Structures are given as structure tokens and as C-alpha cells.
Amino acid sequence: MLLSPHEQERLLIHVAAGLARERRARGLRLNHPEATALLTSFLLEGARDGRSVADLMTAGRGVLTRDDVMEGVPEMLAEVQVEATFPDGTKLVTVHQPIA
């Protein structure tokens, strides 16, 4: 299988997000890379599903809570920016204060 660097990056994000989901399901608190991967994957998949940028910006704030992540992670993740592919092209999705 021959993947472009962009495709490799997307695949890595989804693998990391899958691991984060498993750890979260086991009751473990997520670290910074795991939380970032989970949020990024949520935004990429939402764009693929045809959700709007505005909808994803709002919904992205409800993916994780402070109880889901390790201490200090919410402060490190002031915002998450993802270039996502929507049905009508690629757009930048920014979620400010993603961890409520």
C-alpha cells in the first residue's frame, strides 16, 4: 500500500485516537498527545460526515472534559486547529478551549 505523507499523517492520527479511546474506556486519563489525537480525529471525521465548520467548532468543545485528561492538559490545549476536507473543499477548523 502506497500512502502519501498526508495520508500517512491522517492514518497516524486515527491510530492514536483509537488508542486514546481505548485508554479512556478503561478509565485512564489522557495525556496531551492522546487528547489532541482524539479531538483531531473527531473533527476530521465530522468534516467527512458533512458537518459544518461552525457545528464542529461548537461540538469540538464537548468531546473531552477535565475529568478525561491529566492535570495540566486543558491549559496546554488552548486551541486545536485542523485542516479538514469537507464535501466542498478543505477548510480550517479551530476549536478554542476544547476541554471544558
UniProtKB/Swiss-Prot annotation:
GO terms for biological process: urea catabolic process. Pathway: Nitrogen metabolism; urea degradation; CO(2) and NH(3) from urea (urease route): step 1/1. It is found in: Cytoplasm. It catalyses: urea + 2 H2O + H(+) = hydrogencarbonate + 2 NH4(+). It holds the Pfam family Urease_gamma. One of its GO terms (cellular component) is cytoplasm. GO terms for molecular function: nickel cation binding; urease activity. Heterotrimer of UreA (gamma), UreB (beta) and UreC (alpha) subunits. Three heterotrimers associate to form the active enzyme. HAMAP family: Urease_gamma. PANTHER family: UREASE. Belongs to the urease gamma subunit family. This is Urease subunit gamma. It comes from Frankia alni (strain DSM 45986 / CECT 9034 / ACN14a).
